[in-house]
């Protein structure tokens, strides 16, 4: 009946798991502290985001500047000659839409798979509102029909992002999100 969700799962082993556990330990200590502040929380997000490496954890929160996730993703999009995205919720700001369109303008290729069904139809309308600008720039857009889409996957050149962040304003600039970035995928 199409009421189930389609998602993506992965299994991670080794030192990357230890790094993620340290992030969650920091969150647990923040929650248990007598006076948790937003500044303390953002310090955890920033400090635990990996600055380099072929497998990097990138965390996001309500930063006044670009978060490690948003900054790294912008850099990868700017350098990508090929960009593929599967997004449950897709409603970036106009500046980000322009960056996506620039992939095609540079002679690259971009494809987007977005949700055709949702438990919140405003997210579908928001995504469709963004399509016109992308279609004018020859970006190929597909909507996933069989089930509700919950997947968040970005392939920008040789970098792959998988995690909790949708490609919308809340996920990129406000929500606490976790993405793993894998190089040379």
Regions found by a protein language model. Name each.
Residues 1-185:
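Charged, low-complexity intrinsically disordered terminal segments
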């Amino acid at each position: 009946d199409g009421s189930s969700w389609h998602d993506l799962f992965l299994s991670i082993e080794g030192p990357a798991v230890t790094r993620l556990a340290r992030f969650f330990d920091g969150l647990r200590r923040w929650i248990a502290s007598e006076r948790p502040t937003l500044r303390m929380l953002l310090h955890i997000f920033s400090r635990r985001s990996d600055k380099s490496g072929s497998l990097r954890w990138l965390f996001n929160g309500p930063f006044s500047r670009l978060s490690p996730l948003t900054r790294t993703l912008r850099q990868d999009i700017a350098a990508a000659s090929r960009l593929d995205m599967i997004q449950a919720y897709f409603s970036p700001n106009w500046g980000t839409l322009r960056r996506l369109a620039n992939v095609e303008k540079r002679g690259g290729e971009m494809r987007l798979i977005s949700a055709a069904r949702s438990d919140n139809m405003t997210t579908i309308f928001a995504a469709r509102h963004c399509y016109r600008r992308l279609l004018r720039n020859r970006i190929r857009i597909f909507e996933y029909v069989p089930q509700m889409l919950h997947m968040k996957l970005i392939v920008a050149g040789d970098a792959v992002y998988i995690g909790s962040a949708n490609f919308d304003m809340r996920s990129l600039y406000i929500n606490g999100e976790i993405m793993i970035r894998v190089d040379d995928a």
